[in-house]
Amino acid sequence: MGIVERIKEIEAEMARTQKNKATEYHLGQLKAKIAKLRTQLLEPPKGSSGGGDGFEVTKYGHGRVALIGFPSVGKSTLLTMLTGTHSEAASYEFTTLTCIPGVIHYNDTKIQLLDLPGIIEGASEGKGRGRQVIAVAKSSDLVLMVLDASKSEGHRQILTKELEAVGLRLNKRPPQIYFKKKKTGGISFNTTTPLTRIDEKLCYQILHEYKIHNAEVLFREDATVDDFIDVVEGNRKYIKCVYVYNKIDVVGIDDVDRLARQPNSIVISCNLKLNLDRLLARMWDEMGLVRVYSKPQSQQPDFDEPFVLSADRGGCTVEDFCNQVHRTLVKDMKYALVWGTSARHYPQHCGLFHHLEDEDVVQIVKKKVREEGGRGRFKSHSNAPARIADREKKAPLKQ
């Protein structure tokens, strides 16, 4: 029996099992088994060379956005309109057969937009080219799920289920659970909050399913069984997703209003070029990019080429800014002068851990360099004669 058949068999058993207090431990073990099998399903087959016709393209710019959706929902047309890159579009399905990259120039930044082939139901099980598409989505900073407004409800549920099956968690944050494997000592279980959806016995059974007998577990929130399994697996990707409802020109105004009010959603029409500017603004807000302008000493700030930081990738502190400028700037910095939204007054003297906001201006003041062998004194650039104390002392005269 293959992995896919075993997964379907366990899912059928879960569907037959009634959910109550007596069966919750059994259902928790079944969920752990399915998670293990899905992880095995994503692993490359043994003996393979690792090559093949992949979709991965080199990362470019300050962020990456992936277009995911069913075939013929307008992904290629949207890429062409936002980036100017030609992607073949037609009225029939599976027009796009490979990954087509484009670049969006927005707010002095460059954002890479990827047009991925349409995925079908069962993509997480290897149908079509779903695995390759989802692998590229995992490397993105934001997912735009493009949906047909006339049949969006069913498509949205199917796509979300396929992405969840391969470890993508859309619009969720990592659970506040500390988990660490140990070599000895057994399982240490602690919690800082009352648990209502999982207990210590169920955690032991899940860890036993993974053949883990020595570990530290600490719950900092009232998490679920699925949250704990995600932490044990350790390969989940938490990514933001915006649901883009295209082709709103073919549905009624009531349907458009209903779709626009759903969370994390935006309505557009590529045919009428409607609401594309708001889509770009929404992408910018979701990615959380922060532009920081550098100011050399005694010079005007450079507003042409900003340094782009991100809270999701690295951070937005003065230390992160220094690392982008040069890797040795952190140890050479004495303090930073900051102008902008994050500063209380202009300029504000800040340290390495000061959090920067969008369009801040930063000037780095370096430490003075000490002269070699000069007893800790600073280098002097003047032509003044050396002090008497600095001159080489002569040996005393012999009596």
Swiss-Prot record:
Chain residue ranges for the region called Disordered: 372-399
Segments forming domain TGS: 288-366
Family annotation (Pfam families): MMR_HSR1 (PF01926), MMR_HSR1_Xtn (PF16897), TGS (PF02824)
MF term (GO), any: mRNA binding
Keywords: Cytoplasm, GTP-binding, Nucleotide-binding
SUPFAM superfamilies recorded: P-loop containing nucleoside triphosphate hydrolases, TGS-like
Compartmental location: Cytoplasm
Start and end residues of each OBG-type G domain: 63-288
Alphabetized NCBIfam families for the sequence: small_GTP
Stated name of the protein: Developmentally-regulated G-protein 2
Source organism of the structure: Arabidopsis thaliana (Mouse-ear cress)
Gene this chain is encoded by: DRG2
